Amino acid sequence: MKIAILGATSQIAQDLMLSFSNHKDYDLFLFGRNLGLLNNWIGRQSLDGSYHAQDYSYFNKSQRYDVIINFVGIGDPIKAQKMGSDIFKITEQYDDMALEYLKQHKETKYIFLSSGAVYGGSYQKPVNENTVATVDINNLKSTDW
């Protein structure tokens, strides 16, 4: 199965990639804004040769993916707060890229996840492998998604 992961430098993307690393029938194509950071992470996890780390310019309609998983976001709540509504300009660019792909490949599945949706919006620092999910399901805030 060919899986494109957008926002591959995010903690939740990396957690998923580690869990996928035992599945040899998954062919992962990782896209990130910071390829150096992404390639360093791949090396630290001893996953060299297993994953295809690429710049977003390589994401195009001629590639065939069974699934696109979108983790694109800011990842740092302080940066996100400073950006205000401008954060949507960043995420919109990658959402549009994925949606254009889906128009041409209707069979491709699309999943979007954010740190806020996974961990809740009350975190004060970027998430890491020790972050615990705390979503108050009965009192959701805009930062929870």
Predicted regions and their residues:
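N-terminal Rossmann-fold cofactor-binding loop
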Residues: 31-35
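Conserved catalytic-core motifs of eukaryotic protein kinase domains, centered on the activation segment
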Residues: 41, 78-86, 121-125
